[in-house]
Regions:
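Peripheral, non-catalytic segments of secretory and membrane proteins
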Residues: 1-245
Length: 245
């Protein structure tokens, strides 16, 4: 939709910004740990690790980061009835979208043990697409605002997500054979990958304007609280996967 001067004032809660990055980092660390454990000799278990890594990255590293990050967005000077609420359909779709895309991306990286630049580039592009796709589908789920975007932020966010994803995945998959016992090196790659997710999110967020749908009834805050609870459950599952995957 077109941007105009009637948009609602926005400011940000620093605590939720930091928390959203840390949640993404947990998801990314778990994802790379699970991918590290994949080998060419373990069929069904390899598929389990692939699916689990996609759920951790898509559901926690991307989806949970997005919705916790959106809790940092404070609209209309904090008025309780003016904060972002979500509809169920697009919110659910935004959860499954990155998981499906990442299944393709991470499968490509497992086609050859050491990876090659073509597969890594394709995987980086798909991962960046998963991040962007989740963000904008998730935004479609906002039920009490019409949303507008600055084009330069949309483009910049896409570039950040693709480039940073490519860097993190290329370093990880080219060097993972020498990183079997180097958890801190995998953590650094995860930090870059989480930076791709967070960088994309906040670049897009600062270029977003919110136009309140004044015809709506005063909303309940239940959808906001439910989303945070779901994110907390997913992070807990990620921890269990890390310990027992």
């Amino acid at each position: 939709m077109a941007l105009n001067s009637s948009h609602v004032a926005v400011h940000y809660n620093a605590g939720f910004i930091v928390l959203s990055y840390l949640v993404s980092l947990v998801g990314c660390i778990t994802t790379l740990e699970l991918l590290q454990r994949r080998t060419s000799r373990r069929g069904l278990y390899n598929w389990y690790l692939l699916v689990a890594s996609c759920i951790c990255m898509g559901g926690i590293g991307i989806w949970s980061m997005h919705f916790i990050g959106n809790r940092a967005i404070v609209l209309n000077d904090g008025n309780a009835g003016s904060q972002i609420l979500y509809s169920g359909g697009f919110t659910a779709a935004s959860f499954f979208l990155p998981i499906v895309v990442l299944l393709v991306a991470f499968y490509l990286l497992g086609v050859v043990d050491r990876g090659n630049w073509y597969y890594i580039a394709a995987s980086g592009l798909l991962t960046g697409t998963a991040v962007c796709g989740m963000h904008y589908v998730g935004q479609l789920g906002i039920s009490n605002y019409n949303i507008g975007y600055h084009e330069q932020n949309v483009v910049g966010a896409a570039i950040i997500s693709v480039v940073a994803s490519f860097i993190a995945l290329s370093v990880f998959f080219k060097l993972r054979d020498t990183w079997t016992d180097s958890w801190w090196k995998r953590s650094l790659c995860a930090a870059v990958l989480a930076g791709a997710v967070s960088g994309m999110h906040w670049t897009a967020a600062v270029g977003t304007v919110y136009h309140y749908r004044g015809t709506l009834k005063a909303p309940s805050t239940r959808s906001r609280e439910q989303t945070v609870i779901v994110c907390a459950v997913l992070v807990s599952i990620s921890r269990l996967q890390f310990d027992h995957g």
